[in-house]
Curated annotation (Swiss-Prot):
Gene name of the encoded protein: PNOC
Coiled coil ranges: none
Signal peptide interval: 1-19
GO BP term (any one): sensory perception
Pro-sequence residue ranges: 20-95, 169-176
Modified how: Specific enzymatic cleavages at paired basic residues probably yield other active peptides besides nociceptin. The N-terminal domain contains 6 conserved cysteines thought to be involved in disulfide bonding and/or processing.
Protein family membership: Belongs to the opioid neuropeptide precursor family.
Keywords in alphabetical order: Cleavage on pair of basic residues, Disulfide bond, Neuropeptide, Neurotransmitter, Opioid peptide, Secreted, Signal
Location within or outside the cell: Secreted
UniProt name for this protein: Prepronociceptin
Alphabetized GO MF terms: opioid peptide activity
Amino acid sequence: MKILFCDLLLLSLFSSVSSSCQKDCLVCREKLRPTLDSFSLEMCILECEEKAFTSPLWTPCTKVMARGSWQLSPADPDHVAAALDQPRASEMQHLKRMPRVRSLFQRQKRTEPGLEEVGEIEQKQLQKRFGGFTGARKSARKLANQKRFSEFMRQYLVLSMQSSQRRRTLHQNGNA
């Protein structure tokens, strides 16, 4: 039973490894959903990985993907992931035509700071305080509370060290 469980675990680990063929076939299935009723994801992956002979299933995938902004390539998984995350150019043009969105795009272009300004802004927002970073807007009261708490901790540590030293000396002298 343990051997069967270990085999199953190993197989699940290997199947969870991300490959571009899996992504390509998933995208293809989504694009061809209305036209292909008998789409087999497993066969598509096998054909993509060139473990099976090219069949009529992989050819429409490559054609449909070539027409769009998608590209099927087992050697370049980053391109497919980037294409999945990026909106299409036509969608972006449609959004830019809308007045509210267009004004947001223009504002973003105007307010993009330079590299030097970004460094200055980051330096203003973060200040090193008591071993951690706190925002520049943090109130003086909170910082005073941190100082007071750290002072309490110091006193506690000093007292606990002194008491442990007393116990050790008493124990060594045989008075315990």
